[in-house]
Amino acid sequence: MKQTSIREQYTRPAMRRIETIHFVGIGGAGMGGIAEVLAFEGYRITGSDIAHSAMTDRLIKAGAEVFIGHHENNVKDANVVVVSSAIDETNPEIIAAKAARVPVVRRAEMLAELMRFRHGIAIAGTHGKTTTTSLIASIYAQAGLDPTFIIGGLLNSAGSNAKVGKSDFLIAEADESDASFLHLQPMVSVITNIEEDHMETYGGSLEKMKDTYVDFIHNLPFYGLAVVCIDSEVASELIPRFGRPVITYGESSDADYRMSDFSQSANTCKFTVTNKQGESLTATLNMPGKHNALNATAAIAVAKDQNIANFAILEALQKFEGIGRRFQHYGEFENERGSVMLVDDYGHHPSEVAATITAAREGWPDKRLVMVYQPHRFTRTRDLYEDFVKVLAEVDQLLLLDVYSAGEEPIVGADSKSLCRSLRQRGKEPRHVANSAELASVLADCLQNNDLVLTQGAGNIGQLVKTLAATGMSIEKLKQGEV
């Protein structure tokens, strides 16, 4: 009897027309993860990006052909072209594909195709998607369920942000930034929270954003499941409109899975989760922050619905090795002035930055908190300006890099100079580092014994922290600009 391949098992027969799939912007975390899964399923993968990265190197090892730079010739063999929302319609590869009548689909459409014949678990929300997705994937793996997962960050235990499993479970982030999560039709949907972000997608209307989340839940079958954080005011307000089975989680006494008794010691936290039947689990998570304990509570709710054993859940949380750029601990360094701890975090929304600051304060209360922050997008800085000023005022020393534009045009009054002025009006003394090449020397001037340096943001600051770590945080090397 012929053995069915993963490709035959989880795709429509009509997908036989597709042999070569080209990704424009293949180095992105979400794009690269999907490309990696499709490569494993036997498709020929090509792609382009502006530079080599760890992601493109991994894809090349998986058999993908990666072009550096965008050119119309890159798509000449493609049967379908996949693009992310970050790619402009004027990209020569998109123009060439359309001229050749080659289908051009968004990243989420291809993810939806991967999910079509699998048991999909989609995690949406303004914050916490990557961590929650990673925790669910880790629990399922610990329970022996061997899931496929596609995550927007590097899962340290897997050494990758994507993996093809042998079961029919597919665990993936659902992208609300461009509303493309509406393409997905999962069996389980998680909403971690809903706050104003990416408002240009929703015409500046929170009501339109709410309607879109309702539509996302309506993509579940009537026998599916929505797992919703009841602590999120907007998300909980929408529950009566969902019309699907709902499980809630959070700190509220009304939650179906209630998180309580939170405590943190350095890089780990402990908490208890109790369901409506009075059954409790006391878990230790190898990750700091109450926000991460809440993410873990969501993962527990999903796992319990799948009847995963408590010991597998607790083991997965305790062994969790973290995710790249989510409170990533680079180490504690000894330099000419004493001890310096270096941590990097991806958070770029005021609520995310606040949660990271809280985790740092609770885990290391005796340390002075020095933040190097890179704002991400002018529109976000404009829309959430006062919230940014409020949260950035909470650190002991702030070094503010210029806004990472992500392709946007500058907006007057929504830049780092303006943020510095507003912070000075609050009695703070931020330092504006207009040239990132000067960051090392400016940081050297600021450092004291027992500092916790937190690099924060979604732009290229994730590369800068690696070069800072490479100096061992030596004052002499930092002053010499050896980054």
Swiss-Prot record:
Disulfide-bond pairs as recorded: none
Q: What is its main location?
A: cytoplasm
Pfam families assigned: Mur_ligase, Mur_ligase_C, Mur_ligase_M
Enumerate the catalysed reactions: UDP-N-acetyl-alpha-D-muramate + L-alanine + ATP = UDP-N-acetyl-alpha-D-muramoyl-L-alanine + ADP + phosphate + H(+)
Q: Where in the cell is it found?
A: Cytoplasm
Q: Name one GO molecular function term.
A: UDP-N-acetylmuramate-L-alanine ligase activity
Coiled-coil-forming residues are none
Which positions bind ATP? G125, T126, H127, G128, K129, T130, T131
A single GO BP: peptidoglycan biosynthetic process
Q: Which UniProt keywords apply?
A: ATP-binding, Cell cycle, Cell division, Cell shape, Cell wall biogenesis/degradation, Cytoplasm, Ligase, Nucleotide-binding, Peptidoglycan synthesis
A single GO cellular-component term from the record reads:
cytoplasm
Superkingdom classification of source: Bacteria
Could you tell me the EC number(s) of this protein? 6.3.2.8
> Which pathway features in its UniProt record?
Cell wall biogenesis; peptidoglycan biosynthesis
Family label: Belongs to the MurCDEF family.
Function, as annotated, reads: Cell wall formation.
Q: What is this protein called?
A: UDP-N-acetylmuramate--L-alanine ligase
